[in-house]
Amino acid sequence: MDTEQAIEIQEKDPVSSPPAEIASSPERFINRELSWLHFNRRVLEESVNPRHPALERVRFLSISANNLDEFFMVRVAGIRAQVREGIAERSPDGLTPLEQLKVINESVSQLAIDQQAIWRDLRKFLAELGIVLVDGQDVTKSERAWIEDHFLASIFPLLTPLAIDPAHPFPFIPSLGFTVALQLMRTSDGRPMNALIRMPGKIDRFIRFPGSKDGVIRLITLEQATSLFIGRLFPGYTVKGQGAFRIIRDSEIEIEEEAEDLVRLFETALKRRRRGSVIRLEIEANMPEELRAFVQDALSTTDDEVFVVDGVLAMNELSQLTRVDRPDLEFAPYVPRHPERVRDHGGDIFAAIRQKDLIVHHPYESFDVVVQFLQQAARDPDVVAIKQTLYRTSNNSPIVRALAEAAEAGKSVTALVELKARFDEEANIRWARDLERAGVQVVYGFLQLKTHAKLSMVVRREGGGLTTYVHTGTGNYHPVTARIYTDLSYFTSDPVIGRDVTRVFNYITGYAEPIDIEKMAVSPLTLRKRMIEHIHGETSFARQGKPAVIWMKMNSLVDPDIIDALYEASQAGVSIDLIVRGICCLRPGLPGLSENIRVKSVIGRFLEHGRIYCFGMGQGLPSAKAAVYISSADMMPRNLDRRVEVLCPLQNPTVHQQVLEQIMVANLKDTEQSWQLLPDGSSTRMKAAKGEEPFNLHNYFMTNPSLSGRGKSLKESSPRRLTRRNERNPS
């Protein structure tokens, strides 16, 4: 192994077939859904990582729960729909939809049990640290008096007690809705009644008691506080039994082939989604059996859609606990750097780009430079046109404001707003209307393709002609997520890249297929072909006895054709290192198939989101002659075939070196936040080699300047050079 770390790998025999048979059988792939569940388990494992502060561990637990909710809303919902429709088509790994549901349920059941066990331990740990979550029966006399006043003033007006009988049918419960079910008895005549109390979704789940002794913070959940005062909601009734439940609904949106008004179509589809079928019903374990049957029957759920939870529901809301004022239990604040080269030019972003290409590495370097790029364009009298894609952005988005400002200043502004960005559809409809009111030409792209490419283009009058400035990146134009996602922003005034981006926009706005793209590759047209050609190229170098190396960094590796090409390359002797944060359907390390492929996943303080693809071109890696790309695309069929994505080459020597020799090497070198993927799809934590210090790539970039953004500061500070053990060209 030519990486700098020694890795302890558990010996496992994931498949019974010999390698020769695996190479042509479905067993060569790991199931996509199970691979995602393995990823979510890695996230969950960070909640027990002693290196993390306590509240950050709670945050990781919350993230794993939120991830699981979305998995059911989208992936499980889709598989259940296939089962309902009688579709028996097998996944690439050979499972029918029904078989996939079975293995998913088995894996999720254990994951949910582990989440609850971890929460019980974390709750005790927080109490030791002075953050106490109390149950209703444990409140003190003074706390009960305070919570009663608070309940009547701030909670009671928001609650609607719902009796269930022929005159009061079971109400609609929204997805992720948290509800308390009750068995009541009228005290006057003993008459039984079932009832519901829907917990309001717009207020905090955790209520903090005022005052404390010795700095101890005491909190109670909204549902526990409500349970103390059921009599206020149902006077004249006695509670005989109760329990909370929560549902998850199908969140897929079906789009009609023929649509005259795409915005109106999505508004209608969003209303339908709110009433999607229930695909998961979570019920507290202490709910009486009769009451549980009542809820299940009312929601028309089958037994395999019901999950009995021995613990807390809606664990995604545990993230609210991180709002308590205990900075000592969180990561130390980090303030992103501003690229020194932009400062050297007095804040003139266009002058900085004219000097040479620039890579901004988020979140270590501020996303403000991207906002500044558009704000300066909006206010610069020499700028005549701006074109922009928007997939996801933030509330009160400065990107949207800058585009509106530019249009109001009389510039030609075109914005592609992707309405099909899952769970951001409503926000994007709102942004589209705001932009149209400001005079922006808004388009929605293709009905059957999502535009996922991250592109911004500014055309400026310079020296009697026009210069095109381009920003393209791996992440969304979202200032909030840019503080916690690792992504790359690439700025260039390369006229060839400018022409390529112009053609991509023409493709999006006018369906003009960009047949003469010069440097970039675009899906669904040429990106897959470019990737396969590069993989085959390294395979050919290996067969000629030349150095042959591939490094890739992505979120997901699913596409069967890409995986098979990598298998072929491995069999030819190509050295392949893959950094895959999430889903990986490739089996690494199988003799005769993938023994030259190593796969790792980095899970840490920041969410790894950038996509980088590197090919040695017969020189090995790292090498100044390597082909290095950044992209918005993962290696999934949806990115390669059903989305508009771009693959952008990095050819400026400094930018090339920064991405290849600094960013990629740091990712490969990391041992403190990395997991080694095993042939069966599971993973094990990586460890530094004996006698060597653990390496944390996030800490490295928080304390070392980037190569392309240093400017004059190069004289005062250079990044610590990274090397990998046996840094040589493999032959």
Curated annotation (Swiss-Prot):
Post-translational modification: An intermediate of this reaction is the autophosphorylated ppk in which a phosphate is covalently linked to a histidine residue through a N-P bond.
Source species, domain of life: Bacteria
Residue sites binding ATP per the record: N67, Y485, R581, H609
This protein's record includes keyword Amino-acid biosynthesis: no
Feature: compositional bias, Basic and acidic residues: 713-731
Entry-linked CDD domains: PLDc_PaPPK1_C1_like (cd09165), PLDc_PaPPK1_C2_like (cd09168)
Keyword Phosphoprotein: yes
EC number: 2.7.4.1
A GO term for molecular function: ATP binding
Record: residues binding Mg(2+): R392, R422
Short name of one Pfam family: PP_kinase
Disulfide bonds: none
Catalytic activity reported: [phosphate](n) + ATP = [phosphate](n+1) + ADP
UniProt KW keywords: ATP-binding, Kinase, Magnesium, Metal-binding, Nucleotide-binding, Phosphoprotein, Transferase
GO cellular component: polyphosphate kinase complex
Region span, Disordered: 1-22, 701-731
GO biological process entries: polyphosphate biosynthetic process
InterPro entries, A to Z: PP_kinase (IPR003414), PP_kinase_C_1 (IPR041108), PP_kinase_middle (IPR024953), PP_kinase_middle_dom_sf (IPR036830), PPK_C_dom2 (IPR025200), PPK_N_dom (IPR025198), PPK_N_dom_sf (IPR036832)
Gene3D superfamilies reported in the protein's UniProt record: Endonuclease Chain A (3.30.870.10), Polyphosphate kinase middle domain (3.30.1840.10), Polyphosphate kinase N-terminal domain (1.20.58.310)
Cofactor(s) this protein requires: Mg(2+)
Active site (UniProt): H452 (phosphohistidine intermediate)
Protein family (similarity comment): Belongs to the polyphosphate kinase 1 (PPK1) family.
Function recorded in the entry: Catalyzes the reversible transfer of the terminal phosphate of ATP to form a long-chain polyphosphate (polyP).
Name of the protein described by the UniProt record: Polyphosphate kinase
Native source organism of the sequence: Bradyrhizobium sp. (strain BTAi1 / ATCC BAA-1182)
